[in-house]
């Protein structure tokens, strides 16, 4: 049908993701085109992050995996956030990047 549904999943969005995304998954392929968390001490301009990254990031990745969605994590740059890496040596951020790295490593097995 040539249609793919793309959603950007962030903790400051007060959205029921199952209601907004999963409801159409049987009709269209799903891409979570962006997701991320700035870390527990951050105050992003987009709004508050009501859940800790230790809770929110694994929960969202489990949701993506459970539904077999495709995803891209935002952002592979140390100064554009939410940052997956601390610097260009590719060391993952403790609050977000470590979870993405672990998720991708499991997918590669």
Residue ranges and their predicted role:
Residues 73-81:
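Short, solvent-exposed turn/loop segments enriched in Gly/Ser/Thr/Pro and often Arg
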Residues 1-69, 85-95, 105:
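Extracellular glycoside hydrolase catalytic/binding regions
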Residues 98-109:
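Extended, charge-rich low-complexity interaction segments
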């Amino acid at each position: 049908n040539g249609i793919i549904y793309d959603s950007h999943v962030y903790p400051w969005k007060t959205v029921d993701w199952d209601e907004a995304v999963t409801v159409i998954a049987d009709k269209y392929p799903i891409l979570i085109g962006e997701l991320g968390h700035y870390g527990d001490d951050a105050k992003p301009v987009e709004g508050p992050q009501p859940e800790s990254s230790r809770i929110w990031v694994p929960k969202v990745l489990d949701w993506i995996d459970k539904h077999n969605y495709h995803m891209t994590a935002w952002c592979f740059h140390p100064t554009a956030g939410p940052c997956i890496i601390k610097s260009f040596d590719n060391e993952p951020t403790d609050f977000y990047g470590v979870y993405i790295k672990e998720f991708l490593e499991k997918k590669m097995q």
